[in-house]
């Protein structure tokens, strides 16, 4: 089997940031998949499922309310070091920096019940940690608010 593109990224050099993971074509539409990397792989602890789950619910709610039909998907990476965001359109990392700032500011300032945090709405509603979601959101904002080229383009 051929190695898929995401496994060709040097995770030993990968830093937290916003990266274009891939672009797919569906008819005349371009779908851009972004790698929203929150922790440095293999060098920082991964996020626990509870904070990942809270960020997923808050992030999906925020993005779908803000961008509506432009959002195809927002969800966690299996390695728990970040999230994938798939948007309609041929986009670059730089194009969504302000959006990602707004998203993680929303999460870091969020108070109240997490959207969809009920047995009726979610298959694992009790596994959410808003405090840690805020912690990781603030950590990520430190990177995004001082974004550099190495946080926008995958390392060689």
Swiss-Prot record:
InterPro entries to which the protein is assigned, alphabetical: LuxS_sf (IPR037005), Metalloenz_LuxS/M16 (IPR011249), S-ribosylhomocysteinase (IPR003815)
GO MF entry, a single one: iron ion binding
Protein name (record): S-ribosylhomocysteine lyase
Disulfide bonds: none
Cofactor binding mode and count: Binds 1 Fe cation per subunit.
Amino acids binding Fe cation: 53, 57, 122
Top class in the EC scheme: lyase
Subunit record text: Homodimer.
Entry function: Involved in the synthesis of autoinducer 2 (AI-2) which is secreted by bacteria and is used to communicate both the cell density and the metabolic potential of the environment. The regulation of gene expression in response to changes in cell density is called quorum sensing. Catalyzes the transformation of S-ribosylhomocysteine (RHC) to homocysteine (HC) and 4,5-dihydroxy-2,3-pentadione (DPD).
UniProt keywords, alphabetically: Autoinducer synthesis, Iron, Lyase, Metal-binding, Quorum sensing
GO terms, biological process: quorum sensing
Gene3D superfamilies the record matches: S-ribosylhomocysteinase (LuxS) (3.30.1360.80)
Catalysed reactions, as listed in the record: S-(5-deoxy-D-ribos-5-yl)-L-homocysteine = (S)-4,5-dihydroxypentane-2,3-dione + L-homocysteine
Any one Pfam family match given in the protein's UniProt record, by short name: LuxS
Enzyme Commission code(s) on record: 4.4.1.21
Swiss-Prot/TrEMBL cofactor(s): Fe cation
């Amino acid at each position: 089997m051929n190695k898929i593109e995401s496994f060709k990224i040097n995770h030993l050099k990968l830093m937290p940031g916003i990266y274009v993971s891939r672009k797919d074509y569906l008819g005349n539409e371009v779908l851009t998949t972004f790698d929203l990397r929150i922790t440095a792989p293999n060098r920082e602890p991964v996020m626990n499922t509870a904070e990942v789950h809270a960020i997923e619910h808050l992030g999906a709610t925020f993005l779908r309310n803000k961008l509506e039909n432009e959002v195809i998907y927002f969800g966690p990476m299996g390695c728990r070091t970040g999230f994938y965001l798939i948007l309609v359109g041929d986009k670059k990392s730089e194009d969504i920096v302000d959006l990602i700032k707004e998203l993680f500011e929303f999460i870091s300032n969020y108070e109240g019940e997490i959207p969809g945090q009920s047995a009726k709405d979610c298959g694992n509603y009790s596994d959410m940690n808003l405090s840690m979601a805020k912690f990781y959101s603030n950590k990520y904002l430190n990177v995004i608010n001082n974004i550099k080229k190495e946080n926008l383009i995958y390392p060689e």
